[in-house]
Design a protein with these regions (language model features):
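A conserved pocket-lining segment of Rossmann-fold NAD(P)-dependent short-chain dehydrogenase/reductase
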Residues: 25-48
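Conserved beta-loop-beta element that borders a ligand/cofactor-binding pocket
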Residues: 1-13
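Amphipathic terminal alpha-helices
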Residues: 140-145, 152-172
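Mid/C-terminal beta-alpha module of Rossmann-like enzyme folds, strongest
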Residues: 56-123, 159-162, 169-172
Length: 172
């Protein structure tokens, strides 16, 4: 009896690790330390708040049909849209530099090299960079209809994430 769920780009409260790299990126942006717009900024991703994913997993366990796959996506947005919404909710607007994928991958390799020297694992790896370079516009209609799944709008989730970072003194 197996039901499969597929979440996309998850953000929100959680560990400060590669598995929560999107929240790390949000934190760095709000702190003024993230100035990169991947490629030309038009790459699309589906962004979903962590609590929506938790609720989606529970709904899939309770209502999901065996052998079925459910996409637990959120709002589809380009990087331009994502950072525009982040600037709005954080009330901080920074000039972002468009960085081509090959240069981003080279930077990722540099971070891996730095890990060998410091022993501290990188928060962003070449694998993460590759994964986030693809267009990932997703549709969760099946999960909405069959499971009752829903998700927070991106702006609202970003606001909750920033509030959580402030409460935990992770923001300067």
């Amino acid at each position: 009896n197996v039901t499969i769920v597929n979440p996309p780009r998850i953000y929100g409260p959680g560990l400060d690790s590669e598995s929560n790299a999107l929240t790390t990126m949000i934190k760095k942006y709000v702190d003024g330390k993230w100035r990169i717009l991947p490629s030309d900024g038009t790459g699309i991703g589906s962004y979903v708040y962590v609590d929506d994913i938790i609720r989606g997993h529970i709904l899939a366990m309770e209502k999901g049909r065996s052998g079925e796959r459910y996409i637990l996506s959120g709002e589809n947005a380009s990087y331009i849209d994502f950072f525009s919404k982040l600037a709005k909710v954080s009330e901080k607007k920074f000039h972002l530099i468009k960085l081509p994928l090959p240069i981003m991958l080279l930077a990722g390799q540099f971070l891996l090299l730095k890990t060998k020297i410091t022993g501290k694992p990188p928060k962003i790896t070449p694998g993460w960079i590759k994964k986030y370079s693809y267009d990932w516009a997703l549709n969760c209609e099946k999960a909405k209809i069959e499971l009752g799944y829903s998700y927070l709008p991106l702006e609202e989730g970003l606001k909750k994430t920033i509030d959580w970072l402030k409460e935990n003194k992770d923001l300067k």
